[in-house]
Amino acid sequence: MVVPQKKFANGKRNDSTKSFKPMKKPFKKTKDDVAARSEAMALQLEDVPDFPRGGGTSLSKKEREKLYEEVDAEFDADERVSKKSKGGKSKKRIPSDLDDLGLLFGGGLHGKRPRYANKITTKNISPGMKLLGVVTEVNQKDIVISLPGGLRGLVRASEVSDFTDRGIEDDENELLGDIFSVGQLVPCIVLELDDDKKEAGKRKIWLSLRLSLLHKGFSFDSFQLGMVFSANVKSIEDHGSILHFGLPSITGFIEISDDGNQESGMKTGQLIQGVVTKIDRDRKIVHLSSDPDSVAKCLTKDLSGMSFDLLIPGMMVNARVQSVLENGILFDFLTYFNGTVDLFHLKNPLSNKSWKDEYNQNKTVNARILFIDPSSRAVGLTLSPHVVCNKAPPLHVFSGDIFDEAKVVRIDKSGLLLELPSKPTPTPAYVSTYDAAGDEVTKLEKKFKEGNHIRVRVLGLKQMEGLAVGTLKESAFEGPVFTHSDVKPGMVTKAKVISVDTFGAIVQFSGGLKAMCPLRHMSEFEVTKPRKKFKVGAELVFRVLGCKSKRITVTYKKTLVKSKLPILSSYTDATEGLVTHGWITKIEKHGCFVRFYNGVQGFVPRFELGLEPGSDPDSVFHVGEVVKCRVTSAVHGTQRITLSFMIKPSSVSEDDSIKLGSIVSGIIDTITSQAVIVRVKSKSVVKGTISAEHLADHHEQAKLIMSLLRPGYELDKLLVLDIEGNNMALSSKYSLIKLAEELPSDFNQLQPNSVVHGYVCNLIENGCFVRFLGRLTGFAPRSKAIDDPKADVSESFFVGQSVRANIVDVNQEKSRITLSLKQSSCASVDASFVQEYFLMDEKISDLQSSDITKSDCSWVEKFSIGSLIKGTIQEQNDLGVVVNFDNINNVLGFIPQHHMGGATLVPGSVVNAVVLDISRAERLVDLSLRPELLNNLTKEVSNSSKKKRKRGISKELEVHQRVSAVVEIVKEQHLVLSIPEHGYTIGYASVSDYNTQKLPVKQFSTGQSVVASVKAVQNPLTSGRLLLLLDSVSGTSETSRSKRAKKKSSCEVGSVVHAEITEIKPFELRVNFGNSFRGRIHITEVNDASTSDEPFAKFRVGQSISARVVAKPCHTDIKKTQLWELSVKPAMLKDSSEFNDTQESEQLEFAAGQCVIGYVYKVDKEWVWLAVSRNVTARIFILDTSCKAHELEEFERRFPIGKAVSGYVLTYNKEKKTLRLVQRPLLFIHKSIANGGGSKTDKPDSSIPGDDDTLFIHEGDILGGRISKILPGVGGLRVQLGPYVFGRVHFTEINDSWVPDPLDGFREGQFVKCKVLEISSSSKGTWQIELSLRTSLDGMSSADHLSEDLKNNDNVCKRFERIEDLSPDMGVQGYVKNTMSKGCFIILSRTVEAKVRLSNLCDTFVKEPEKEFPVGKLVTGRVLNVEPLSKRIEVTLKTVNAGGRPKSESYDLKKLHVGDMISGRIRRVEPFGLFIDIDQTGMVGLCHISQLSDDRMENVQARYKAGESVRAKILKLDEEKKRISLGMKSSYLMNGDDDKAQPLSEDNTSMECDPINDPKSEVLAAVDDFGFQETSGGTSLVLAQVESRASIPPLEVDLDDIEETDFDSSQNQEKLLGANKDEKSKRREKQKDKEEREKKIQAAEGRLLEHHAPENADEFEKLVRSSPNSSFVWIKYMAFMLSLADIEKARSIAERALRTINIREEEEKLNIWVAYFNLENEHGNPPEESVKKVFERARQYCDPKKVYLALLGVYERTEQYKLADKLLDEMIKKFKQSCKIWLRKIQSSLKQNEEAIQSVVNRALLCLPRHKHIKFISQTAILEFKCGVADRGRSLFEGVLREYPKRTDLWSVYLDQEIRLGEDDVIRSLFERAISLSLPPKKMKFLFKKFLEYEKSVGDEERVEYVKQRAMEYANSTLA
């Protein structure tokens, strides 16, 4: 709507004449104006009223308008005069965009009408404006939207919707990309405008898509049918999606269409558009339809009272042309509003200059609202065909495209409209005057003509207009860079410097694009004054570094600009050997980071920098330096590039022996403050670096050695830690050199829970990095590095420290190694730490001697640990005594106070002392004069005259022996100990360990007792010292890992060595042999073939034995690398032949059936595991260990650990080196299976379950088995024979004798002894094994002979395996297999079955065969008939007398007389009468239909049923024909009993809350007999559920049909309402037709089985072929298979039935589905999952509601209430408008005695349609009466009768329920209320009649008369 002419943005009129002055910049707004608009936005975009307060006027409306026109005319005249007079003449100027865009704020109006159409620009857009935009980009944190006028807006992720709980900030990219798509039209609102900091003069437009802002001011009344609204998807439900409109109390909903299309692709948070289809004003729910065609075609209706606030961008309106403007059209729409359309939004985007002719006044068109400005109340419309169709205009061109043949369509004052020949359709383009003529002032009409073809280049795109912006300037076609797509990394181009700042320079290409040259790239060197380097306006040559997010970066470094080397701009371009230029971005100690083009980055390791050893990279390189580098490796997937500054690769050495972990020697070249540089001795000149920390394991010794080393000194043993180019990193640490072969250099060499040596390479706050060989590095987190959680890592370790690391985890995928450095898990297990200290002490002593000769070190040889030495006292002080030695210079002795032994020493005296310790570096000897040391020593002194007397080495001490010691001297690094128990032998122990060097050490005192272990005896490697390990240092006992012995050439595989046993383990002997070699002897390497249970009994620790080395240590396993494999088998030691590795491989060959021996090392519940050899293990399954049950029960006891067990090879897994054994011989030819032996044995056992087992099971085998399942009915037992092999024991093969319950005493999991009777293969390729548990079979009896009872009782125990073994009149026994109404089947053996007809079941009549002959019952009978060809056997179960004739034949008619009263049972009901079995006679009589009743009887079958007990009178006896005529009329029985000959009906008063079965249930009830369980009511759980789906509970009384159930037909007519007579009669007819159809089906199905019931599968196949659409037959077939325990076959029959039954027979198919439900519910594995799968399939083919009800019935009958409740909840959600579903929910709740019924009722009333409320409430009340609380039922009835007091059907049902309860006072009171109503006579007659019948049944004559009197009174009052 166009605003009044002189109103401003705030709506206030300003009468000041200053306000009418011409404005030079009408669009420029002050900061205050913007701030005011922002404030308005913050106040939720409230409109400011025209007159905020006061200011009334006395002028009328017409007078005001006239005054405004006069002022406007005067103002326009003044404006024109002032323009002309200023400067004397008007100036020519280029028309600006502001002139033809039109104003939104009153500056461009002419009279009452605007001169220009409203257009949006950056200068007039303001907060609060609503616009229609199109999504152009979906970024990680925002959305870019193209707005009208070519503007670009941004939407933050937090402004896309009103939802705050979506977690947008966690994963914005995924969320925004899911709910928005490029090209989507969206309505938005302007939040704020920001000045773009990156580009001056541009403003950022921040938008919001929140509907709470767009729909502000809307109310529920604003929603009208047919309107289009935007909404956010709040949640997705089963039936549709819940929508959010941004309004607090209004909810939307979109239902899922039938085809489900509406649901596809819809996601939570998505913004959609929909047409209002339904409005629920009660619940304030608006239903929408999101059909795109409906949304696009929907017009906004012209509603009364619509305000400006209700207009939303995107609305389609019917607009009428009001006038044509200079650059558009003015429309009015919706009666009250005006809007404009500019030239670029016309219907034809390529309109020529005559476009105005197309829009005549009052012409109506469809337009869509483009934008709305609430402040000026201006509206923009669009006629663009695509936007009107609710689609974004397509664009077929791109920025930078050049078109040589663009056609001029129209020439305007502001520019040219062109037609670009794009495909598939032309695209309009507009060229402004500036881009067409440049700075020249010229008229476009003179230069261009319409229809001309010109060359144009696309500058940009306006997506909302579908318009391209072009230029005709020549400069636009010249430059190589015009758009961002033209920019390629590495390209060289010219650019002009336009600005210079402290961060760099901004340059501009010839095409207009801008780029940045960072400060570091302005020169090769550091630039301090960039403005002097770059001059604004200078044109320079640059190289493009990259273009990311339309931001171009360039460089001016000369080396890069002029480089001729290949450009590296992507990781895929990086190939090994590529040489290119880059620049350094970061320098670290371990290398440099180098960057290339487009952000590609690589790393140069330190050894590839080409530095001299000891040089610092920072001193050689600087950040920003351009370098030439070579790619050494590239991993494209992980984007890792490794580089080298050494262009030509060089090898470390030509000597291949130098590799990681090798030992080398070298000569010191130079020494720096941090490292020692050595020249390594090799074929080529190679240098190595030894850091100061790697000179020794002890930190103090390393510093001392560093100070003593000099160039030229030779270092003999150096470990190669790492090879860095042509340099090597070396180490002189003894701990690493000693275990060089064990140090890992690759992930594959690491094994969790092993301990390895390494060194600390770096420390951080969170942990410690430990390095091994090469660059293999692990990390020890702080929690795993120190035992004390409060300790600091930096205070516990130092860089370079030797450590022992426990490998916790190895993650090769992430290349991560997790370590533990805790002393508790990494303590030393040897004395290497203190040993290294003494070795380094010797080395330091040698270094200290200026002349390394023997004479300088010879003094040490004069002293020996523990020997006596003679010396002279030099001086004495508080600490002790200093001693001089004769003929030994510069060596002193020292006796501490503790070791003076109480003697008084004076200077000059001579003493003989014991040597305790020697410090070669300090040239000091520690001595002792303690008597116990001296006295013990003198006992071993010889009588020689030598001054030097030596103690003998104690032979009693052994390695690993634990001893008690006494501290003699406490040194800084070690203790001097004596061992009193072993002659005071002197030993040495370290006070710290590798990992505790920096930690405080435990304080020891002289004389303290400690416990230690002997780790090394005196030898040259220990400097002649006995080395001990303190328990306090090790923390735990010695682990299994010990130091690895060096490999000696004398030890070879096959050599015989002498070894000493150090440890005896359960399955191996640990030995030491040779020079520090360690090995083991496996338990299988002791004896040749003996099965001794204790092979190690003859060995003891310390024993010396001879053994042969049979295998080298396994290098792949770090834990076992130190152990050689040895053997002491006699045959192995005798064999002098050459031994090699081939002998080892021969032991891995095994043949099937081969007998092998192993030793038990593990037993679990199922398997016993054996060690067969060093590398091969075996396992035996529990059932393969014995065939006796009692032995299997004691399985674990029979196989103690270490026992020798033999077995026969069944299978062999060569890959895992595992045998499968059995303990019974296998009957087949031996065959090698080491290489497979066949296709089956190639694979592991698990891959061929059961196949190998069945190959070695034969008929007649006696096996051990375990009962895995007791099958239902007469299915027998399922017995497990192997891990994956099962067999079946037939019901008749369980016991020898015929016992009533063969399964009694058996349980699942029980072990049994069984015999294989038969092995056969099924059609599926699986093996079926028939077993027997009968002890009478050969091999099954535990005694030597059978009992006499079993031998003599052949008839009882015999099993007839063939039909030929049977003959008529032979006595047989068997078990009932299944029972039907026509008879039953019995099983005589596992192969023979027989049929028993109903007439032969019993001597007397059998009323219910299923109950009297249940499945599994033991019966005895006689064979009547045998048909070998058809394999049919008929048996009778009737008993016989002595004469062999039936008892019934012994009776005679003479015993009966005419007139006698007899009792009996109805045998058969015929249309002509009843056949009655007369009790105690066995004879049958006929009662003709004429003799049944005194009245005429139409339908005999409806009144009488077979099996009912009746009384009758004998009317006639025909002895010739042996016929008896009976009569049952009442008159015949008057003199007898009062009992009438009528069926015994059920008590109608005892009603339950169970559904009533339809008539079909009687037929289908026959399936109860086929092996299914029954409930207490006798209803089948599996197949009888077929009828329950159509069942109606007795409480579900249809109130519309209530008359049918409660009254006779005459009463019904009185009760029916007149308006419903036709409808109800139709329903009654339908019900009657349905009942007749069910009866026909029942009769037909009965006839199918009348003549001959199928007895085997072939007969059933014939039957289903003849009646393929009968579900009854198919279900019978399923039941038959289930009776045979063949569940899979029953399933296959169900599947066949579903495929076979015609698709039109929906009821029959549904019957099969329900039977399928019950089948899976009983036999599924697991049942719940199996039923669910079948249920999901059934829903797709049948009526879902019926399927749900059927499954609910299954769950309720099987009392699975949790599943039933879960299903009911789902049903309520899916069918919430179904009354039946809600009633089932209430019925279920009442059954489970739940009290919260009212909440269910309330929910149901909210969901159900109103017309179903009465029915629901009344039936709920009936349920309460019958199953719940009667008072609640009364309350419900009373409530509904208050609303509908004249509904006699409600009164009738209410009365019936009260009558059923039997409270007379309540009933009579209710009747009194009913007959007091004012109802029509017919209804009152019905009530009175019901009252009268009630009183007749329970009352007396007085009450009957009372009712009659009340009826007369009513009749009289009515007639009056």
UniProtKB/Swiss-Prot annotation:
Q: Name one GO molecular function term.
A: nucleic acid binding
Database matches in InterPro entries: HAT (IPR003107), NA-bd_OB-fold (IPR012340), Rrp5 (IPR045209), Rrp5_S1_rpt_hs11_sc8 (IPR048058), Rrp5_S1_rpt_hs1_sc1 (IPR048059), S1_domain (IPR003029), Suf (IPR008847), TPR-like_helical_dom_sf (IPR011990)
Spans of the HAT repeats?
Answer: 1651-1683, 1685-1722, 1726-1758, 1759-1791, 1828-1860, 1862-1897
Q: What is its main location?
A: nucleus
State what protein this is by name. rRNA biogenesis protein RRP5
Report the gene knockout effect: Aborted development of female gametophytes.
The uppermost taxa in this organism's lineage are: Eukaryota, Viridiplantae, Streptophyta, Embryophyta, Tracheophyta
Q: Write out the GO cellular component annotations.
A: nucleolus; plasma membrane; ribonucleoprotein complex
| The organism's place on the tree of life at top rank | Eukaryota
Record keyword Kinase present: no
Q: Does the keyword rRNA-binding apply?
A: no
Role according to the record: Involved in the biogenesis of ribosomal RNA (rRNA). Required for the formation of 5.8S rRNA. Required for normal development of female gametophytes.
Q: Which GO terms describe its biological process?
A: embryo sac development; rRNA processing
Q: Which gene encodes it?
A: RRP5
- Localization, UniProt: Nucleus, Nucleolus
> One Pfam family for this entry, by name?
Suf
Region annotated Disordered sits at: 1-65, 1535-1555, 1605-1652
Keywords annotated in UniProt: Nucleus, Repeat, Ribonucleoprotein, Ribosome biogenesis, rRNA processing
Which tissues is this protein detected in according to the database? Answer: Highly expressed in flowers and at lower levels in roots, leaves, stems and siliques.
Q: Where is the composition biased (Basic and acidic residues)?
A: 1620-1652
Q: Where is the S1 motif domain?
A: 128-210, 226-291, 314-384, 400-473, 490-557, 577-646, 661-733, 753-822, 866-930, 958-1031, 1054-1129, 1153-1224, 1260-1334, 1369-1438, 1459-1529
